[in-house]
Structures are given as structure tokens and as C-alpha cells.
Amino acid sequence: MKQSLPDVSVCLIYLAGMAVWGFVAGRILPYSWQDETKYPFRSLPFEKNGRIYEKIGIRKWQNKLPDMSKVFKGLMPAKKLEGDLAQKLPVMIKETCVAEVTHIFLGLAGVICPFLWKGLGVWCLTFAYVLGNLPFILVQRYNRPRQMQLLKSITQKRKTCVRKSYKREGKEREDTDFEL
């Protein structure tokens, strides 16, 4: 008699495989495919540039979530913003898009399980898997508008400083000549 794994075990193996696949796909997705100013990454009106998530206490719990940049230090940019923020923020903003796409994919991959395998355990595992990816999506939706605003502020301050510097030196310069 042939013995097979219980459906919940097969589902668990499938979900682990999808997590690995999602991680690898997230690392190879080109940043150019992800425009933080357009749908689906642009902050929606009801999100109020991420402030809506403060109602669920996101500031208190977001740093308690596992951080893959600490696990795979060479593969992912660190989340700490040190040094030249104007240079690092665009990368961080793109990384929020990558993370959001990855966790949405993982959530959708989890929804498929009950259609492939049967049992209450499969439903429980699916529910936990989908629900477990939701906080990561919310953190990206919360942080991205804040990072974009910070980058805009830094860029504006640098432009102002350069303009003032050139005015003191008695030089005129076109806005298009500014290097940030």
C-alpha cells in the first residue's frame, strides 16, 4: 500500500517553496518595473499618505516584524538610513515596492491551497499564511509615502542651499544645472 503525505504537509511544503520563490523573484525584479508614483504603489486617498495605518498602532509593532535585510545582509539593502539619505532613500523606496509585490504574491499563493488540497488543517494554514503576509504589506504602504516625503524635503533643501550659495558668489545658474 502506497503511503502519501497528509494534505496539510503537502500544503506546507508548497507554501515554503512559494516563500523561497517569492524571495528570489523579489531579488531579481528590476526596479524599473516598479514606479512608486503609480498604481498599485501610489498611496490611495483613504490611506492619507500612510497615516491611516497609525490607527492600528503600526509605529509600535512594525519594527518587531522579521527583517530579511538582517538575515541576508549581502542580498538586500539594509533598512537603516545612514549616510547620504538623498542617495539611499530612492533605493529604500524601490525596496518597499519589491517587498509589497512579494508579500502580495505570497498571500495570493496561499489562497490557492484549499482548492488544491482538502481538510481543516489546510484551511487553517492558508488563513495563517495569508494573514501573516498582511502586516508586511501594510508596513510598506505606511513607510513608502513617508520616505517619499523625506526625499522630497531633502531634495528641496539641497536645491535651496545650492541656489543661496550661487547667489552669494554672484553667479546665476539654471535649475537644470543643479546636482543633488
Language-model region placement:
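Cytosolic-side membrane-entry/anchor segment at the start of a transmembrane helix
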Residues: M1-V24, L85-V91, L138, Y142-L151, ...
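Hydrophobic alpha-helical transmembrane segments of multi-pass integral membrane proteins
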Residues: I13, G17, D67, K73, ...
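Hydrophobic core segments of alpha-helical transmembrane domains in multi-pass membrane proteins
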Residues: Y14-L15, C113, V122-N133
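Alpha-helical membrane-inserting segments
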Residues: G17, W21-A25, L29, A109, ...
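Membrane-interfacial segments
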Residues: I28-W33, T37, K118-V122, N143, ...
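Transmembrane alpha-helical segments and their cytosolic interface motifs
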Residues: L89-G121
